[in-house]
UniProtKB/Swiss-Prot annotation:
UniProt xrefs under HAMAP family: dsDNA_bind
Protein name: DNA-binding protein MM_0803
Top-level taxonomic group: Archaea
UniProt xrefs under InterPro entries: DNA_bind_arc (IPR022889), PDCD5-like (IPR002836), PDCD5-like_sf (IPR036883)
Stored PANTHER family: PROGRAMMED CELL DEATH PROTEIN 5
GO molecular function: DNA binding
Pfam family, one: dsDNA_bind
Family per similarity comment: Belongs to the PDCD5 family.
CC per GO annotation: cytosol
Keywords: DNA-binding
SUPFAM superfamilies on file: Double-stranded DNA-binding domain (SSF46950)
């Protein structure tokens, strides 16, 4: 009787485990599809952002922005978002050149305190 009960318990555990594995396998394609859709949406947004930046920046300014993004990604991303915001709000009358981009960067960065050491 005890052996029969143990066999039933084992069978029940196997069934639950099999059902759990099947649920995970059924869910996995939807997770992969969701990840794929998110990646597609991110790529599309990035393409739109680059298109806007090509319209509002001169080639020299775009080159500076690319260099900035390689060295300081967070600051580069912040500057891109600010430029796009300016363009979408209609506050840009012409393309931004390298000098104007430098000015924007200077405004964005906090003032650095200069420390000098003098020996006596």
């Amino acid at each position: 009787m005890i052996a029969m009960s143990n066999d039933d318990e084992l069978e029940e555990i196997r069934k639950r485990r099999l059902a759990e594995i099947q649920r995970q396998q059924a869910q996995q394609p939807s997770d992969m599809q969701a990840a794929y859709q998110q990646e597609q949406a991110r790529a599309e947004m990035e393409a739109q952002k680059q298109s806007i930046l090509r319209q509002i920046l001169t080639p020299e300014a775009r080159e500076r922005l690319t260099t900035l993004k390689m060295s300081r990604p967070a600051l580069g991303e912040q500057l891109e978002l600010q430029l796009i915001s300016l363009a979408q709000s209609g506050r840009l009358q012409s393309q931004i050149d390298d000098e104007q981009l430098k000015t924007l960067l200077m405004r964005m960065q906090p003032k650095k305190r200069k420390t000098s050491i003098t020996r006596v």
